[in-house]
Amino acid sequence: MPYIMVVQMELVATSGGSLPWFSGSESRGAFLSIVGQACEELAKTLHSGGRSLYALKPLNFKSGYRVVGGKGRSLAEAGVLFERGARAVLEVSLFDDEVSRRFISNVLPVATGLTVKGISFRVDALAAHLVDPLKVIEGSRDWEGGALDVHFHTPTYFNPLTGDQRYKILYPEPLHLLASLTASAHALTGVDLPKPSELAECIYISGLSIRTPRMEA
């Protein structure tokens, strides 16, 4: 059973600049670039189709920045202005033991910096820890239920369970949400979990807030 390797890169901006508030694609490109420079074969493995072997939290600024735009609208329209010396964190979770080993041995020793949309950041500190997904599931068995808030901080869609796969599900309907979660949990732990349909019968949405970027005509 694979462990999840969580790696945090603490970054410092070498110059001032601006980025979109949600920099998912830019962060992913920067991450795959530093992997490719250190180990091209590993970058191809991570970029290949099929089950995702990693999850990336986009660049998250901690100091030396301010958010502009998006007031009264979706934050997806906002931007981040930051100064030289601004601090940020990029976090990646690796879901495969061999990928984790190669990342730790081949990439981290030479990962001195990365470039996000033409803006350079130097790596100031690195931290890594292991998460046992089986213990996470076992720990949740004592949960007595009740309300649970779910926040999607990045644009998210679900693949339909039936029908034309080209049309995605934008609404976080419980069945599709649970199908995604149980599939990931089973792939990581091998534990047999209740069917998503059985879980969905016990859940209802009590409140919902969805925001999308404004589309120009």
Predicted regions and their residues:
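RNA-interacting cores
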Residues: 1-217
